[in-house]
């Protein structure tokens, strides 16, 4: 956006944050960057209108099918799509580095791996320790399973020091336990999981993994957007 920060942010926390990370969906870097470059494309206009509308209809009819399709859609040929993805990933890296203030405010390079099998959330927020990160953002098109995601983090990050990363299960309250299933995992895969997934998101604006709908207890703090355990 070309808007000044004062035009974008209408509220401010009383106590500043110590750190932040922007975890955009890596799967749509290519599409979003194409639409940024050529917003007059019909599909790009439809996306922009749905985003501006901020409605359930826009999410259900436009964004949700895009998220769960599991198919790369850049509106351009494969090579141009790859270039577009890489360009936006680099812009994300540069933005995080530009905002970083060592010792005062830490901004992490980050992205979201967005696998949604059967419309369930197995998503992970990938938070990197520094700007030494994989050349391409880890995504569920190229790494469609949790196992291939961990292996990619090992090969493209951990084996390439000083790259380091944590993978945080995100919105797992609508994943029906899929983010934590270990059936059939080898000792090596269990080791990778233990290495990368050292914490889990418990509470965020789309739900809380501490809440269980339909249970015998009542918690007023859970009375929002709770769809699945």
Q: For each of these PLM feature ranges, what is it?
A:
Residues 1-229:
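Extended, charged catalytic domains and RNA/DNA-binding interfaces, predominantly
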């Amino acid at each position: 956006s070309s808007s000044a920060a004062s035009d974008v942010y209408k509220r401010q926390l009383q106590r500043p944050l110590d750190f932040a990370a922007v975890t955009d969906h890596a799967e749509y870097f290519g599409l979003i960057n194409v639409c940024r470059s050529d917003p007059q494309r019909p599909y790009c206009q439809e996306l922009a209108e749905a985003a501006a509308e901020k409605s359930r209809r826009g999410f259900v009819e436009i964004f949700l099918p895009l998220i769960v399709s599991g198919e790369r859609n850049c509106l351009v040929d494969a090579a141009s799509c790859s270039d577009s993805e890489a360009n936006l990933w680099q812009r994300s890296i540069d933005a995080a580095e530009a905002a970083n203030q060592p010792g005062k405010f830490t901004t992490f390079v980050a992205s979201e791996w967005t696998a949604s099998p059967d419309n369930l959330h197995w998503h992970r927020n990938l938070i990197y320790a520094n700007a030494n990160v994989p050349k391409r953002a880890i995504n569920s098109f190229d790494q469609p399973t949790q196992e291939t995601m961990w292996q990619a983090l090992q090969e493209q990050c951990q084996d390439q020091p000083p790259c380091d990363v944590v993978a945080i299960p995100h919105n797992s309250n609508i994943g029906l336990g899929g983010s934590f299933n270990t059936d059939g995992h080898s000792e090596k895969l269990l080791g990778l999981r233990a290495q990368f997934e050292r914490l889990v998101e418990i509470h965020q604006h789309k739900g809380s993994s501490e809440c269980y709908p339909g249970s015998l207890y009542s918690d007023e703090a859970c009375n929002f957007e709770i769809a699945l355990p």
